[in-house]
Amino acid sequence: MRDRLNYRTTGDPKRPALLLVHGFLSSNAQWQPNLDLLGERFFVVLAELWGHGDSPLPEDHSDFTIPRYVAEFEHIRSELNLSCWGVVGQSYAAGLAINYAIAHPERVTGLVVTNSRSAFGDIATSRKEKAKRNQIAASTLTEKQKNNRHMPIHPIYAKRLPDDVKARLVACADNMTEEAINKGGLIRRALNSESLIDSITPPFMIANGVYEKSFQVDLSRLKTGRPGLKVVDMQGGHAVNIEAADEFNATMIQFFLNP
């Protein structure tokens, strides 16, 4: 039997549907601060990446491609008998969401992505940062490597997360297998979506956590020559949906229900 992404739903199926996809080293716990309010206004679908949360980790490397993720999102939509839905991609999932919206624009009522260096970061800069991280990691693997805390993106280093949410996200990241991390990295380069922005036809918005300074550099470059690019600044950092949950929730309702 073919592996399928794990997903769950909350809210009234008669309401407008909204797909939420979390980022790397995370799980559906990413959306904990958003579900009470969004679940009142939408039929929320939460999907987990391969090897994250309760999603399986396929053996075949061919499953770790953009087209396969796009097909999985379509499978979920079809299985739920939804004609269309809004799509939100957080961090690593931003590139996946953009590719899905371009492949199936007729199914997407609107697209929102959050801060994402994998989708919008300068490739040359990313290479330098990766080399620097590898240098640091080589000298500090020991105990930290056992629970992935040698990775700079591990949520243990997040400074603005509520304690209960942080505890769940840290547990998710600690328990990620090395195989899941390595396979998830197979599509890292393919996630870069800067060249695709102008091909997005559904309504599109970037929910920008202004405290992540490195992403502001990427965003400034994205805005150049794109005066119509919709960006909503929020008082949060990389995990803007958590750190600025009230702003994020209100913006999602406005964007998807009152465009």
Can you say where each PLM-predicted feature lies in the sequence?
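Conserved alpha/beta-hydrolase catalytic His-Asp/Glu region
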Residues: 122-128, 142-198
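Flexible "cap/lid" loop of the alpha/beta hydrolase fold
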Residues: 98-103, 109-141
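Conserved HGGG/HGGXW glycine-rich cap/lid loop of the alpha/beta-hydrolase fold
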Residues: 5-62, 222
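Alpha/beta-hydrolase fold catalytic core
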Residues: 1-19, 39-43, 78, 82-83, ...
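Structural signature of beta-strand start/N-cap positions in the alpha/beta core
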Residues: 17, 43, 83-86, 107-110, ...
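Conserved loop-alpha-helix segment in the C-terminal half of the alpha/beta-hydrolase fold
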Residues: 203-236, 242
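Active-site loop/oxyanion-hole signature of alpha/beta-hydrolase fold enzymes
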Residues: 8, 45-92, 250
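Post-His helix in hydrolase/transferase enzymes
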Residues: 242-254
